[in-house]
From Swiss-Prot:
Organism: Pseudomonas putida (strain GB-1)
Localization annotation: Cytoplasm
InterPro entries cross-referenced by the UniProt entry: DnaJ (IPR012724), DnaJ_C (IPR002939), DnaJ_domain (IPR001623), DnaJ_domain_CS (IPR018253), HSP40/DnaJ_pept-bd (IPR008971), HSP_DnaJ_Cys-rich_dom (IPR001305), HSP_DnaJ_Cys-rich_dom_sf (IPR036410), J_dom_sf (IPR036869)
Protein name: Chaperone protein DnaJ
Binding site for Zn(2+) 2: C163, C166, C185, C188
Length: 374
């Protein structure tokens, strides 16, 4: 029986886009999948036919050959790529959500043994957790070996068949004009074997989507951008390939009091007008608790005090940084009549004596010189 045109099988125009092909194939695959039609030979044949059509049309080189030469361009007996059950990338069709999460396709298809992809997980911590270290539990979506087929992709009790396209050697010779080029077999991807009876749990992929719960020990002193590598906790490899790694990337949330710059911490300390003028002592917060800070008389806004060793001990070793407290002098508001009278008396007593406000006096002298030079 002659094969139907692949575009006709999928029900699309010859100029259909990749998205249109995928949509059409997904619709047919869901409709005729053996799991949904157990024992229905006609549905199984239609499923295989749709699978074969999509394998060819979703591959740019195979599609070009089919468009130019028809079925002869992709017939294994003619030295082309060939098509058949087991070629379509089910992870691409049924795994859009996970593909988006991991930032792209999964690659590999049903090729040779390949290492699993590395995964990235962003872990948010507060400043105290980052400085002191902590242990957290995370839940990560990943791909693990399919248990029913033990990662082989083949239905239990079945075995992969010799690839009819390359005869089991994993290479094909393509004739391009006067030249003959040897390349990796596009059907078995160099394995020499193909899965003709795929596992219904993983659709022949050998891997299934699953959430994994892991305990992550975060060392003290980490900062935003630091990475913790968990070896072997990434995606499972394909066809016996090694498992990838999981990289936990640290992101430290903003703190309501402290700002961090490397191993040093910074904070702003508001003090009263009178404490700034007369001096005093106040308590300031640190990550280890409150400490007393002595304020000398005549302290101005912007004055910075250093508390040594009250910063962060870097994760890569070395002494702890410092806590730098920047003073912000608050002007009194909501004054009572008596308070206002006292301040007016103070202002009158200071008027004409520049020694009490050296910075202001110098600034006004500069202004006078500026206008005098105009």
């Amino acid at each position: 029986m002659s094969k139907r045109d692949y575009y006709e099988v999928l029900g699309v125009e010859r100029g259909a886009s990749e998205a249109d092909l995928k949509k059409a194939y997904r619709r047919l695959a869901m409709k005729y999948h053996p799991d949904r039609n157990p024992g229905d030979k006609e549905s199984e044949d239609k499923f295989k036919e749709a699978n074969e059509a999509y394998e060819v049309l979703s591959d740019a080189s195979k599609r070009a050959a089919f468009d130019q030469y028809g079925h002869a361009g992709v017939d294994p007996s003619m030295g082309g790529g060939g098509a058949g059950f087991g070629g379509a990338n089910f992870s691409d069709i049924f795994g859009d959500v996970f593909s988006d999460f991991f930032g792209g396709g999964r690659g590999g298809g049903r090729g040779g043994a390949q290492r699993g992809s590395d995964l990235r997980y962003t872990l948010e911590l507060n400043l105290e957790e980052a400085v002191r270290g902590t242990t957290v539990s995370i839940r990560v979506p990943t791909l693990v070996n399919c248990q029913p087929c033990d990662g082989s992709g083949a239905k239990k009790g079945s075995t992969p068949s010799t690839c009819p396209t390359c005869g089991g050697i994993g290479q094909v010779r393509m004739q391009q004009g006067f030249f003959s080029v040897q390349q990796t077999c596009p059907r078995c991807h160099g394995q020499g074997k193909i899965i003709t009876d795929p596992c219904t749990s993983c659709h022949g992929e050998g891997r299934v989507e699953e959430y994994k719960t892991l305990s992550v020990k975060v060392p003290a002193g980490v900062d935003t951008g630091d990475r913790i590598r968990l070896s072997g906790e990434g995606e499972a490899g394909t066809h016996g390939g090694p498992t990838g790694d999981l990289y936990v990337v640290i992101s430290v949330r903003e703190h309501e009091i402290f700002q961090r710059d490397g191993k040093h911490l910074y904070c702003e300390v508001p003090i009263s007008y009178t404490d700034a003028a007369l001096g005093g002592e106040l308590e300031v917060p640190t990550l280890d608790g409150r400490v007393k800070l002595k304020i000398p008389e005549g302290t101005q806004t912007g004055k910075q005090f250093r508390l040594r060793g009250k910063g962060v001990a870097p994760v890569r070793g070395g002494g702890a940084g410092d806590l730098l407290c920047r003073v912000a002098v608050e002007t009194p508001v909501n004054l009572s009549r008596r308070q206002r009278e006292l301040l007016e008396e103070l202002r009158d007593s200071l008027e004409g004596d520049s020694s009490h406000s050296p910075k202001a006096s110098g600034w006004f002298d500069g202004v006078k010189r500026f206008f005098g030079d105009l």
